[in-house]
């Protein structure tokens, strides 16, 4: 079988995702699609709108054949570790031929060329990167400036301005960089992103961004206006959730629990992997004085620490990453493939995986639980505080979704 992998969050699944899946099938001519999907918390440090089993079900209803969970240690990390965890998982199951991802660039040759530079870090690039960081510039901006300088020295005709400031391009580069890093045989493909850019806050008829859809859901009770933005299956699921008088979980909902943990002297923000240069002191001052997450992030923000990085740190604190050696864990390849759901074709793919995989396949929680899986279990417990439809022990109680 010719199997293609996709790396996703589906928060929530929308028409842009459907377009990506259809184009993926077209350009890779694949027999099946395996999705590696974030669990209950996503890459920007937020809780997912719907639980991971519901999102897996929606993925299966809209073209995916097998959904595997990206462990929380990677799913809530920066693009580098997010991509490393996902690509190492796809490589580890040893049956994936292709990886297809969206990008604003839409040019796989330029993405591969650029990712090779980021992986090898030539001396002049490395020196420029260090100089920009020493000036107090955030890592993402410093890397973009260093790349532009390096490309100019090489007299490249392509304009690299803004390549590294667009969300899907950043992830695309990290996917390819990590495929090089792990010496994978998986062949990368890209689909040019259509419609609104990732951070657009306004609904567009057919291809609204996930950000715009979440923004709308957070501010409106009438979900009918999403009819042109998401497939019918997704809209029905969102309405069902709302009709059961459940509140959609958002990052702001974490703040009360974060403050409670801090005031209880439980854990330590200094132990988190992305905390350095005394930023924890700014965080502690914000927790002492602020009443909302937004107010706290505004107070903590510095030139080097972006809003996303701060939110990610607070999310890590909320789900208990300060209690483990999370930096060591996220630098290791994904240790298992946990099944969230599959259809009949996915069942055939699973048979191939079980014969070929280099990593364990998990469909129910084993007796022996390692630190990575234990964090996933703890993330579900924390998520259940925000989404009342989720039981704290659902990781033990729920079976993979079968469609």
Swiss-Prot record:
It catalyses: cytidine(34) in elongator tRNA(Met) + acetate + ATP = N(4)-acetylcytidine(34) in elongator tRNA(Met) + AMP + diphosphate. Its main location: cytoplasm. The gene is tmcAL. HAMAP family: TmcAL. It is an enzyme of class 6 (ligase). It is found in: Cytoplasm. Its EC number is 6.3.4.-. Transmembrane segments: none annotated. Catalyzes the formation of N(4)-acetylcytidine (ac(4)C) at the wobble position of elongator tRNA(Met), using acetate and ATP as substrates. First activates an acetate ion to form acetyladenylate (Ac-AMP) and then transfers the acetyl group to tRNA to form ac(4)C34. ATP binds at residues 7-20, 102, 168, 193. This is tRNA(Met) cytidine acetate ligase. It comes from Clostridium tetani (strain Massachusetts / E88). One of its GO terms (molecular function) is tRNA binding. Keywords: ATP-binding, Cytoplasm, Ligase, Nucleotide-binding, RNA-binding, tRNA processing, tRNA-binding. InterPro entries: Rossmann-like_a/b/a_fold (IPR014729), tRNA(Met)_cyd_acetate_ligase (IPR008513). GO terms for cellular component: cytoplasm. GO terms for biological process: tRNA modification. It comes from the Bacteria.
């Amino acid at each position: 079988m010719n199997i293609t992998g996709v790396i996703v969050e589906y928060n929530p699944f929308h028409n842009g995702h459907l377009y990506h899946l259809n184009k993926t099938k077209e350009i890779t001519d694949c027999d099946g699609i395996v999705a590696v999907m974030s669990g209950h918390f996503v890459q920007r440090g937020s809780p997912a709108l719907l639980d991971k089993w519901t999102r897996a079900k929606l993925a299966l209803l809209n073209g995916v054949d097998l959904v595997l969970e990206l462990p929380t240690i990677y799913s809530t990390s920066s693009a580098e570790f997010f991509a490393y965890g996902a690509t190492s998982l796809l490589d580890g199951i040893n049956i994936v031929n292709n990886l297809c991802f969206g990008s604003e660039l839409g040019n796989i040759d330029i993405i591969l060329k650029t990712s090779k530079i980021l992986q090898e870090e030539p001396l002049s690039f490395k020196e420029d990167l260090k100089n920009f960081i020493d000036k107090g510039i955030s890592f993402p901006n410093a890397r973009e400036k260093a790349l532009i300088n390096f490309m100019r020295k090489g007299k490249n005709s392509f304009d690299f301005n803004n390549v590294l400031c667009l969300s899907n391009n950043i992830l695309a580069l990290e996917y390819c960089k990590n495929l090089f890093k792990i010496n994978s045989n998986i062949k990368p493909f890209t689909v040019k992103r259509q419609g609104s850019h990732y951070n657009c806050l306004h609904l567009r008829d057919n291809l609204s961004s996930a950000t715009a859809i979440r923004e709308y859901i957070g501010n409106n009770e009438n979900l009918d206006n999403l009819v042109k933005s998401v497939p019918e299956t997704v809209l029905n699921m969102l309405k069902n959730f709302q009709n059961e008088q459940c509140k959609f979980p958002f990052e702001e909902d974490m703040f009360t629990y974060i403050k409670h943990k801090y005031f209880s002297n439980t854990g330590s923000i200094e132990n988190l992997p992305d905390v350095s240069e005394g930023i924890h002191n700014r965080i502690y001052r914000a927790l002492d004085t602020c009443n909302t997450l937004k107010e706290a992030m505004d107070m903590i923000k510095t030139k080097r620490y972006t809003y996303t990085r701060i939110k990610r740190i607070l999310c890590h604190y909320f789900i208990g990453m300060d209690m483990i050696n999370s930096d060591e864990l996220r630098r290791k390849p994904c240790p298992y493939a946990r099944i969230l759901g599959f259809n009949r074709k996915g069942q055939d793919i699973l048979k191939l995986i079980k014969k070929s995989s280099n990593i364990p396949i998990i469909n129910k929680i084993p007796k022996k639980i390692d630190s990575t899986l234990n964090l996933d279990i703890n993330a579900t417990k924390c998520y259940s505080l925000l989404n009342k439809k989720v039981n704290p022990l659902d990781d033990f109680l729920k079976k993979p979704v079968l469609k």
